[in-house]
From Swiss-Prot:
NAD(+) binds at residues 26-27, 48, 96-99, 116-117, 145, 191-195, 208. GO terms for molecular function: hydrolase activity, acting on glycosyl bonds; nucleotide binding. This is Glycosyl hydrolase family 109 protein 2. Belongs to the Gfo/Idh/MocA family. Glycosyl hydrolase 109 subfamily. Its cofactor is NAD(+). Pfam families: GFO_IDH_MocA, Glyco_hydro_109_C. Binds 1 NAD(+) per subunit. The NAD(+) cannot dissociate. Keywords: Glycosidase, Hydrolase, NAD. It comes from Phocaeicola vulgatus (strain ATCC 8482 / DSM 1447 / JCM 5826 / CCUG 4940 / NBRC 14291 / NCTC 11154). Gene3D superfamilies: Dihydrodipicolinate Reductase, domain 2, NAD(P)-binding Rossmann-like Domain. Its EC number is 3.2.1.-. Substrate binds at residues 174, 208-211, 290. It is an enzyme of class 3 (hydrolase).
Length: 413
């Protein structure tokens, strides 16, 4: 018997979404602060191994006049939190390697799940998420905020309305100079003696693909009429962190002697079933300007956010639009999420508009019994690139097949 899929999954509406937060470090505490500005939510539980993180979270609840939440601060207590029937949504902001275990258990207890990026670090764990979401008929959304970037949403709107013609190629990336963070204390937001640094010492490929890939997959309707079939990945040698450590701490320092498997720059090429291509890059250890590329090529036009926003349309000639003409097109095709929810974020002086839109949309869909903007197949498809890119790199950049997590149902969209 064929397993029912969860494409366009709807669940009963939840008038007030009761949330349990697990992982209250830097990213988790920021998420909790954002949720203080949303209507229709109640924070029921807080879970973290560090009591000081729990105390910070409790202070935030008091500051915003929210009811006191149950706290879970002992090893393994996240399971007990997931079992609580007074919680509708488990919001996961732990380290990368524990995302899947917590998400799977929460789904099995009947909870909906929102989990930080990447959702999983292996293909096997991607399948666990998909299988469990299908078995339990519960939402599992990876919190890919870059899909709610204003330029990305405008691009999506233009693609869906055919302004750029037939899409043939797109590019995404996570390029962010984080060298100083690799040697800074965790309390200062750094990765020294931290699981992120350890991962870079043991792995290669692209460990953080979803910021660049998420918007691209939405532009290309991945698993909604097309799918990613295979990839080829290549990494440069590692030099950036070693050179930085030598300059800052000295050539004979312990920091400069540390070794890393992760190359400075990873480039992955992806081929889709419809013959389209995706270029995906990862670089956090060279002195480059921040970029996610956000590039899309079509038969009628071209858009790119970085290094500067660019829109070229065939009907307007061979030069990119500029000045009032560019602004007029961007305003004309501004996505409703940006126009309405983004404007609300600005009125509330929220520091990050795309995070606010992401949070708002998740809660709005749960409260109204609607399908989520990102489903478990998105989470699996975008996250599986972590293992598959490493596999390709270690085998001399051979092509590696990308699983069809929808089991053929992508053709029906």
């Amino acid at each position: 018997m064929k397993r029912p899929n969860v494409l366009n999954l709807t669940c009963p509406a939840i008038p007030v979404v009761r949330i349990g937060f697990v992982g209250l470090g830097n990213r988790g505490i920021l998420a909790l602060e954002r949720y203080m500005h949303l209507e229709g939510i109640e924070v029921k539980a807080l879970c973290d191994l560090r009591k000081e993180n729990i105390e910070r979270a409790e202070h935030i609840l008091r500051e915003f006049g929210r009811p006191e939440a149950e706290n879970y601060s002992e090893e393994g207590m996240w399971r007990k939190m997931c079992e609580c029937k007074e919680i509708d949504l488990i919001y996961i902001c732990t380290d990368w390697l524990t995302h899947t275990d917590i998400a799977v258990y929460a789904l099995q207890q009947g909870r909906h799940v929102a989990l930080e990026v990447p959702a999983a670090m292996s293909v096997a764990d991607c399948w666990r998420l998909v299988d469990t979401a299908e078995e339990t008929r519960r939402h599992c959304m990876m919190l890919e905020n870059c899909c709610y970037d204003a330029f990305a949403l405008t691009t999506l709107n233009m693609v869906q309305q055919g302004v750029l013609g037939e899409i043939t190629h797109a590019e995404g990336a996570y390029i962010h100079d984080l060298r100083k963070h690799y040697f800074a204390d965790e309390k200062a937001g750094g990765y020294h003696n931290h699981w992120i640094k350890l991962y870079s010492q043991q792995h290669t490929g692209n460990p953080y693909p979803t910021h660049g890939l998420g918007p691209v997959c939405q532009w290309m309707n991945i698993h909604r009429g097309d799918r990613m079939e295979y990839l080829v990945s290549m990494s440069s040698r590692q030099a950036g962190l070693s050179a930085y450590a030598g300059q800052v701490f000295g050539a004979s320092s312990e920091e400069a002697a540390q070794s890393y498997e992760m190359g400075d720059v990873n480039t992955t090429l992806i081929h889709t079933a419809k013959g389209r291509t995706i270029l995906l890059q990862y670089d956090v250890t060279t002195p480059r300007p921040y970029s996610r590329h956000q590039t899309v090529c079509g038969t009628k036009g071209f858009m790119q956010k970085y290094p500067v926003p660019c829109l070229l349309l065939d009907e307007y000639g061979k030069e990119p639009l500029s000045g009032e003409q560019f602004e007029r097109m961007m305003e004309q095709y501004k996505h409703p999420f940006t126009a309405v929810i983004g404007e609300e974020a600005r009125r509330k002086n929220m520091p990050n508009e795309m995070n606010y839109i992401m949070d708002y949309r998740l809660i709005h869909c749960l409260r109204n019994g609607l399908p989520l903007d990102q489903d478990v197949y998105d989470a699996a498809e975008w996250s599986c690139i972590t293992e598959l890119s490493e596999r390709s790199v270690r085998q001399g950049s051979v092509p590696v097949e990308i699983p069809d997590f929808t089991r053929g149902n992508w053709k029906e969209r």
